[in-house]
From Swiss-Prot:
InterPro entries: GIY-YIG_endonuc (IPR000305), GIY-YIG_endonuc_sf (IPR035901), UPF0213_domain (IPR050190), UPF0213_GIY-YIG_endonuc (IPR022992). It comes from Escherichia coli O127:H6 (strain E2348/69 / EPEC). CDD domains: GIY-YIG_UPF0213. Signal peptide: none annotated. Belongs to the UPF0213 family. PANTHER family: UPF0213 PROTEIN YHBQ. HAMAP family: UPF0213. This is UPF0213 protein YhbQ. It comes from the Bacteria. Residues 2-77 form the GIY-YIG domain.
Amino acid sequence: MTPWFLYLIRTADNKLYTGITTDVERRYQQHQSGKGAKALRGKGELTLAFSAPVGNRSLALRAEYRVKQLTKRQKERLVAEGAVFAELLNSLQTPEIKSD
């Protein structure tokens, strides 16, 4: 099974783009060359701000969704403190208990 990664790319105007991939370097190069997400085209210099292994595709999709819901401040904290991402990932792996 190929591991999936979550990554954040910082644009020239300091915005953070969130995505998932099985190969961070390849995907980053695609974004750099304008062949990646339309949201990053024409945004100037891009830098890889954060990447971390997530596990399988299903978990990566859930992590991506959760990170995209975060505020800019929360995303900056995630970039600065790896423990924040570890907590987020752990919360996705813990099964939710539904009460009747």
